[in-house]
Amino acid sequence: MEEDLIQPQPDSETLTSPTSEVGAVELVEHEDDERVEQDPGYVTPPKDGKESVPVSPLTEADYLGGEDDVLLKHVLRQSTIVQEAFKDYSGFPLTVEELSRTYEANLFSPRVPPKKQANGTCEPNPRLNFYPVFAVPEALATYHIFFKNQRIPLSCRANRTQGDRILHLKAGAHIPEIVSLEEVPKIFEGLGKDEKRAANALQKSETENQNVLVELDGDNARLAVLKRTIEVSHFAYPALNLPPKVMRSVMDHLLIKRVEPLDSDQPEQNSEDGQPVVSDDDLARWLDSHDPTTLQERRKMMMAVILVTVELECLQRFFANPQTLRKIEESLHYAFRHGYVRQACKISNVELSNLVSYMGILHENRLGQNVLHCTLQGEARRDYVRDCIYLFLILTWQTAMGVWQQCLEERNLRELEKLLVRNRRELWTAFSERTAACQLADLIFPERLMQTLQNGLPDFVSQSILQNFRSFILERSGILPAMSCALPSDFVPLCYRECPPPLWSHCYLLRLANYLAHHSDLMENSSGEGLLECHCRCNLCTPHRSLVCNTELLSETQVIGTFEIQGPERQEGASNLKLTPALWTSAYLRKFIPEDYHAHQIKFYEDQSRPPKAPLTACVITQSQILAQLQAIQQARQEFLLKKGHGVYLDPQTGEELNTPSPSAAASCRPQKHAAQREQASHCGSAVPKATETARAVGRGGGILGRQPGRGSFRRGGNGELGKSRRGAGGQTPQGRGGRNHRQRRGTVFQRTRSEPASDGESRTVPAAARLVESQP
């Protein structure tokens, strides 16, 4: 292609900058076609000796250009993108549908994956600037566009005034389980005897009363407004079925043969269409019974296994895995900017909640919202959080099913059909419905496939993504989101006994979402002031990532950026350690103790009487002795600056004055020797070999957030030992203000004001604890 697209970096980091989004695409033309502007102060003389005709400058009326209209660049860029989309297309599409499909495939499903930036995210794609804003691309909605349109049960969540109380989970609650039709043979879809219609309910005639939502006494404010706003009888439930290719093979080789279109040329091939795969004679021989009732019950059981139970079994195997539950809760902490993710954002000063991903590709989207739940309280907050997690589970499962569907080829389906035929008798003669479902799940959803999908899922999402998904579902159901306050989870029953079997998968995901909301401590706000600002009671945060419970971690955060441990200068392989916010945050995000994570039970640390199974340690400096020595050095330095120092000292972080001496105190200052500080400095100097050895063991470690300079370091004295004067071993003759010592001291973090002189005695008796932090020249 003759022309390429580039995207220059915006001049400003703010989203309101005009160069950040619009107009960021520039077209690189050939050098022959480029117009080079000359300096108006000097004109190059023509080579042929003839004077060139001067070009009239652009006036105010035609500042957009004459022959080379700048507005044509927009059309040129768009035509370049369209030309690239049809570069490998045989022939030109004749319909709008073919044009849209090819254009979207080039934008969202390119042959070459997007390049990664240094921070791990994908680089911005300028080709997307011409795609309709806020439109859902059909190329991306491979599995998310399928729905199960079904009548809303009268026993749905919206018609249960005590739904919030029923869904409340206490400490010790376990993860929800699945059921089978043998365990729940009868279904109740009524309103219930405990529910009473509201006295002020709108009266409607029987012909007009097609609304499933009933106004009840005890409805919360949101549901009361919802029931007076809309009238619905059916809802588009997102599809949770197994891939169609798999289900077609299972139906054709286990239950009933699919009916194909009639072929008049070969009528013998159409004779078995629509017939059961297993005849009555074969089934009677396998079961050793000719009772018609027994045979009919067995056929009902196999139909329930294929249509309902095996789907529930695959859902439970995928989501109930401890590693998957941990990753789901981590994604929820990012989506709600909660717990340890909020703590990491605060210390690193990087908004980690801007990271989103899809199918393993990481993106940075600063337009997403992650604090919308903070505007709600009480039952409204719990309903919103529960619905967000419910949609997140649906989105994760649909993504997995889409990947599974796209990977299957004819060769794989033929092998699957062989397995089904080989195990047909074993499946039909299984002990129970749950046993048959487990055996069938082992065939169609093997362990290798499940682990592969679990390794790539779930994705990082934001609340804005879930809100768009919510609006997409409601619009497909004929509900206008702007005029109602409906949630998709309002139309799902709360228990299997009140839910029709085709919706059992949605009932399981709603119950699982409620469990995850309680297990992640998202239902209530447990944070407070001070150290409790980012507190979360879940097993991912407390006690190992909590600054309240882990004192070693708190001590480590207090020495971030205050020191640098240097190894021997001439020794090969010597490593230094500087605890920067980026290094600490990377280690903090990776810190996970599986022994104290209870995936299948709500078991908060504050509700336990026993100590944690693993010791509470810091992230980078895991030895408490080294951490205590660093904290003692920092404390000694601060005490010296506040009590014995002269002049005005500034805080390295806030710039505030740490001590402001009065005129009388400044006049009475005399050179004094501080034996206590010397003792402290010599004691700290003996700990350096041990600290240097620890620095090599810990290593510097790579950080995903980039490196940031520290604010202090350990440096050697004149003879290579800490605690000694930099002017030599004895520190005899002090130098004046113009000497080398003053030039080194002038660049420290705690600077002396020029208006206050320093005496020679003071320069001689500065303790080592204060000189160890002079890392910035």
From Swiss-Prot:
Q: Name one GO molecular function term.
A: RNA binding
Which protein family is it in?
Belongs to the adenoviridae shutoff protein family.
Q: Where is this region: Disordered?
A: 1-55, 261-283, 652-777
Keyword Transport among record annotations: yes
**PTM comment, free text:** Might be cleaved by the viral protease. Phosphorylated. Tyrosine phosphorylation enhances preferential binding to tripartite leader mRNAs and allows ribosome shunting.
Q: Which residues form the RRM domain?
A: 317-435
Instruction: Spell out the subunit comment.
Output: Monomer. Interacts with hexon protein; this interaction allows chaperoning and trimerization of hexon proteins. Interacts (via N-terminus) with host initiation factor EIF4G (via C-terminus). Interacts (via RRM domain) with viral mRNAs that contain the tripartite leader; this interaction allows ribosome shunting and expression of viral late mRNAs.
Q: Where is the composition biased (Basic and acidic residues)?
A: 753-763
Please give the biological process terms from Gene Ontology that the record holds. intracellular transport of viral protein in host cell; symbiont-mediated suppression of host gene expression; symbiont-mediated suppression of host translation initiation; viral translational shunt
**Stored InterPro entries:** L4 (IPR003381)
Name the UniProt record assigns to this protein: Shutoff protein
Give the free-text miscellaneous remark of the entry: All late proteins expressed from the major late promoter are produced by alternative splicing and alternative polyadenylation of the same gene giving rise to non-overlapping ORFs. A leader sequence is present in the N-terminus of all these mRNAs and is recognized by the viral shutoff protein to provide expression although conventional translation via ribosome scanning from the cap has been shut off in the host cell.
What are the Phosphotyrosine sites (modified residues) in this protein?
Y334, Y649
